[in-house]
Amino acid sequence: LYKIGPHTFELGLSYASGQNALSIIRSEMRSIVSQVDEVCQMGVLVGQDVHYLLKEEGHAIISIISDVGHHLPAHVTGLGKALLSGLTDDEVRQLYAGYRFFPYTPNSIMDLDTLIAALQDIRSAGIAYESEESTAEICCVAVPLAENGQVKAAISVTTPKFRYTDEKKQQITQLLLKKRQLIEESCRIQNCRLVF
């Protein structure tokens, strides 16, 4: 005879809370897409990779290598760098100890010191930028999503370089910063955990 214990109940509550958080995030991602007509994605950090969990697309055609269920090296994506910014420099050094950096494009980060310097800038600004680091002709803006001061996920907007004007970059930046605040506040008010 088996019975459900308190740990199973807690696991179920955690799953339900994560699903509610995903619903909040997806709603805000749809709002972002409706305003900028570009691809919006959400992901989490798993080891040295960003794993893509949600994706919303606009009407504009864009071909990108990431998709829901896929993963890419975090250090070459805006989404990944936003996630890595939640780690301390020492944690990043430990995570990338012995890592072999691969040049996906000529703009890819190729060493640990450059990555750490980029992450320090992201921590200061609260936003990450990627310009053709994982894919030629593709740019990305991303923000981390935190719970109790710890980065748990990130959302991004990806756009082809030819549409990535200074005005578009500024529009996306302001929108993502606003949506980050809305998502984090909504999750806090609704008691939704950023657990995925």
Q: Regions from the language model: what does each represent?
A:
Residues 189-196:
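Short, highly charged C-terminal tails/helix-capping segments
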Residues 12-16, 103, 159, 163, ...:
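Short amphipathic alpha-helical interaction patches enriched in hydrophobic/aromatic residues
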Residues 107-182:
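Extended hydrophobic
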Residues 37, 92, 101, 124-128, ...:
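Generic structural signal for secondary-structure transition and capping sites
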Residues 80, 84, 88, 177-184, ...:
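Short amphipathic alpha-helical signal-transduction/dimerization elements
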Residues 3-98:
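Amphipathic alpha-helical effector-binding/dimerization core
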Residues 14, 35, 167, 182, ...:
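Amphipathic, soluble alpha-helical interaction motifs
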Residues 30, 93, 120, 181-184:
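Solvent-exposed, non-membrane alpha-helical residues enriched in polar/charged side chains
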